[in-house]
């Protein structure tokens, strides 16, 4: 089973690909102040970060084909801890959330990549647990 894990943070985006329990790609993409300054809102970073994730995977010689994609959970309404399937409603909730943080992009990027790969997207223990 091949799993892509995406963890967007305030100054980096971490990307890992696992084949079963073995990591086959582990990267931390650093974002400079200058890079992020071009975006007045966190949500404007969506395409930028998604492209970086996909480029990192391609540069490692891996296909964008996964059995599952998991993103860092965003700042949703308070919910119990656990694993959640990402859907369009969740993406909309995190994209339009009043509290913005880069982690909000995790479920959206996961959903977009998973949709293209034909697999499910998940988040685990969102930051509001």
Question: Predicted regions span which residues?
Answer:
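Phosphate-binding/catalytic loop of phosphoryl-transfer enzymes
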Residues: 103-107, 111-129
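Short glycine-rich, Thr/Ser-proximal phosphate-binding strand/loop in the N-terminal lobe
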Residues: 3-44
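Conserved active-site "lid/cap" helical segment
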Residues: 30-65, 70
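Glycine-rich anion/phosphate-binding loops
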Residues: 45-52, 98-106
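A generic structural motif
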Residues: 19-24, 64-65, 119
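Short, structurally constrained coil/turn elements
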Residues: 9, 62, 115-117
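Short beta-strand-loop/turn "lid" adjacent to the catalytic site in phosphate-handling enzymes
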Residues: 57-102, 120, 128-129
């Amino acid at each position: 089973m091949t799993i892509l894990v995406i963890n967007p943070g305030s100054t980096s985006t971490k990307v890992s690909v696992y084949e079963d329990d073995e990591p086959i790609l582990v990267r931390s993409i650093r974002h400079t102040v200058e890079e992020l300054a071009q975006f007045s809102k966190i949500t404007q970073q969506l395409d930028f970060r998604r492209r970086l994730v996909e480029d990192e995977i391609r540069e490692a010689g891996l296909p964008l084909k996964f059995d599952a994609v998991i993103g860092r959970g965003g700042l949703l309404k308070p919910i119990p801890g656990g694993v959640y399937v990402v859907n369009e409603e969740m993406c909309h909730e995190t994209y339009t959330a009043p509290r913005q943080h880069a982690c909000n992009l995790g479920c959206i990027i996961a959903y977009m990549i998973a949709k293209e790969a034909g697999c499910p997207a998940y988040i685990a223990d969102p930051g509001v647990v």
